[in-house]
Amino acid sequence: MSDVGQLFEENAALIALLNTSDRKRDSWPSIANSVEREGSAVRLLMHEIDPSANPLFDDEDPEDYENGCPTLFGDDEFGSPPRRRAELEQAREAARAELRTWADTGLDFISVLDERYPNRLRQVVDMPPFLFADGTMKQDELGVSVVGSRKATPDALAFARDTADMLVDEHLTVIAGLAAGIDAEAHRQTLADGGRTVAFIGTGITRQYPPQNRDLQREIGGRGLVLSQFWPGQPPTRYTFPMRNASMSGYGIATVVVQAGEHSGTRIQARQAQQHGRPVILRDQVAETTQWGRNLIGRPGVYIVSTVDDVRNALDDILNTDRIMQTALDQLIGAYAETR
């Protein structure tokens, strides 16, 4: 969606839906998927305000839904009650004001309806409905997550640096979470090598966490890209970091786990990568010393590595498989188009 005025209204409607949703019934990713499927947050919002006057689905495809026109937050064939309608309208007006404030202060808001939204992230079921960006967006870049313990050993830090070196040599983007330890080391080495790095943060875009990485975050924003899927002032919580890990997994083509303990948050990203169909490159020490690592051995898309050369070979295999699958997909799309 490239029309600025239309996108503004779509973004306002999306924010209104998010701010008035029942979080017990509707997660943000489910709302993002509903908006993506419908192709319009405005239509969803208007359907919430008056379902009978604003149907969502084409009458030619009634099998796509049951009970006529279900509302996002619950069915109501007689339309939303007046109080609910007023709440939605007020939320939309507040969202418009918020969007103007963000724009005036230089914050870059990118929703799922924005053509700049990362394509790979659109492919995962738990895609965030929006991102705040500081830096340069690249639509279809090939990136690899390098993640691991905050309290990393010298050996693990060296492995992270060498992996970042290799990724830069291969013209791949280095993705990490700006955490202390492995993540920060991968970011720093990439910048030192003149490569591109993307940081997914577990806070709002106006915050810096941990504080010691404040300068690093600014440098990444100036030379690469910092992304946040939270409201600008969101503080770090036990929930924001797993959500950030899921987005890192969806954004990249693979995840390299350098070091992690039995209860490390890194295991969440490894699990999410498996659910997303993204390969996991697991250092042998992690596979040998953790139960969750051992459980991944032998699974499709899981590579156990000992050296950075092993990581390179795994990525060669992953990229080659991606090319074969993309070629086959293009052929199928072409064949289908010829029948239309």
Language model: regions and residue ranges:
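Short, small/acidic-rich helices and loops at N termini and domain boundaries
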Residues: 1-113
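Glycine-biased, small-residue-rich flexible motifs in mid-sequence functional cores and linkers
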Residues: 1-10, 19-25, 105, 111-340
